[in-house]
Amino acid sequence: MKRRAAPSKGKINFENIGALLLDFCPSPFEILPVSLPYKIATLLYCFNAEGEVLLLERAQEPNRGFWSPPGGKLKMDVGESPYVCACREAQEEMGLNLNPADLHLAGIISEFGYQGRTHWLMFLFEVRVKVELLPPPHPEGRFEFFPREKIAGLKIPQTDREQIWPWFWQYRGGFFAAHCHCHGENQNQWTLEESRTGSGK
C-alpha cells in the first residue's frame, strides 16, 4: 500500500516574528482598563475688571501644587446639574452667590484615563459677573489673579497647557467640545469635536 505524503507545512519566518509580535501586543497605555472611575466636574473661569483670570493653587489631588480654575465635582447621588454644581462651588470656594444665568458654558472636555486613574467629564463655565475681591485662602488652596500672558509661565496641568487654555481663548464667547485620550509621558491625543467662535474678549 502506497503511503500518502504528509502535507507540507508553512515555514515560520523568524526574521519577521519580532515585528509581528510588536504589531500584536499593545503598548502598556493601550491596555489601560476602561473600567476606571468616571467623574464629572465643573471649572469656573472668573475675571476681574482688569481682565485678569482668577486661579487656584491646588492643595488637594488631583494636580496638587498646580494652578487651575476653581471648581469641583458634581453631587451625582442627588442628580445635581453642572450649572447648579458650578454655583455651589462658587459659593463654597469663593463666597460668590451666582445663579445659572451668570454662567456661560464655554466648553466641555472629556478625558480618557487621566493620570491612569480616572476618566473625567468637565464643564467649563465662564462667569459673567466680575470678581473684584481676591477670595481668602480655602482648604482647596489659595487664589490669585493673573493676566493672560502670565498663565503660560505658571505650573499648570499638562492638558491645560496643551489645548484647554488655547481653545478657551480661541473660542471665548462661543463654545468648544473636545476629547483627550491621555497617555503616559504626556503623549496625549486630542480631538476637537465641536467649536463655535464667539465675540472673544
Task: Locate each region found by the language model.
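Active-site-adjacent beta-strand/loop module that shapes the phosphate/pyrophosphate-binding cleft
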Residues: 50, 111-134, 165-171
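NUDIX/MutT-family hydrolases
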Residues: 126, 135-167, 188-196
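Conserved Nudix-box catalytic region and its N-terminal flanking loop in Nudix hydrolases
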Residues: 52-91, 188-201
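Conserved hydrophobic/aromatic beta-strand scaffold that supports enzyme active sites
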Residues: 45, 55, 122-126, 145
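Conserved N-terminal beta-strand and adjoining loop/helix that marks the start
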Residues: 28-54
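A short coil-to-beta-strand element that immediately follows conserved catalytic motifs
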Residues: 97-107
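Extreme N-terminal basic, low-complexity initiation segments
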Residues: 2-10
